[in-house]
A protein has these predicted regions:
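Bacterial N-terminal signal peptides that target proteins for export
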Residues: 1-9
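C-terminal segment of classical bacterial N-terminal signal peptides
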Residues: 16-22
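Extended terminal accessory/targeting regions
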Residues: 22-205
Length: 205
């Protein structure tokens, strides 16, 4: 995706959604705290959170994002952008939470990716879409180990963008035909990533 197209997508998405309340929820998946109010940062490519915003997961753990946080959706793999741009639709609120905790690495990559799924479901993202996005993040999203400093570079995926797109399509087919639970989805992602296209990364495991 070109930077121009990415910019246009972000412009349309924020213009349409800024200030929308996050008070909806399927309580089984937690709930949001505050409102999503955002604007573009000075570089025209990042989104700046204007008001504090947060999410409480099903276990009661709070995932807060402070006002002033800048995000560009980078924690959502680029292979998903054509299908699910990270700042459009109901999953926008979950993408901000996920970006922030991928940046600061306060919690494990496993918990951070799992909260992306639960936060999407709490925002009424349909089950299949949430599973496809979670599976792709599990495959290609950032990973880190204990003690990794905020901002420290993550290992790059070992698949090209074209290979990632191919794997996302296969993941989509698996979710739509098998309706896996999350444990089965993670196991399937591991099998995919241990194949000839992309050996499973060992970083942060």
């Amino acid at each position: 995706m070109t930077m121009t197209l990415r910019y246009l997508l972000l412009t349309a998405m924020i213009s349409a959604g800024a200030g929308v309340s996050a008070s909806w929820a399927d309580s089984r998946f937690g709930h949001y705290v505050g409102k999503f109010v955002a604007e573009f940062g000075g570089d025209g490519r990042k989104v700046k959170l204007i008001e504090p915003y947060g999410y409480v997961d099903p276990a009661g753990e709070q995932w807060d994002v402070p006002a002033g946080y800048l995000t560009d959706g980078a924690s959502v793999p680029s292979a998903l952008w054509a299908l699910y741009p990270p700042f459009t639709g109901a999953y926008r609120s979950a993408a901000v939470i996920h970006d922030y905790y991928c940046d600061n690495k306060q919690r494990s990559w496993q918990d951070t990716h799992k909260v992306f799924y639960n936060a999407m479901r709490a925002a009424d993202v349909d089950e299949n879409t949430a599973k496809i996005m979670y599976g792709a993040v599990y495959l290609f999203g950032p990973r880190w180990g204990p003690g990794t400093a905020p901002g420290q570079r993550n290992a790059a995926p070992k698949a090209t963008p074209e290979q990632q797109e191919e794997m996302v399509e296969k993941l989509k087919t698996f979710v739509e035909t098998e309706n896996p639970d999350l444990d089965s989805l993670e196991a399937h992602a591991k099998r995919m990533s241990s194949g000839p296209i992309m050996p499973l990364r060992k970083d942060g495991e």
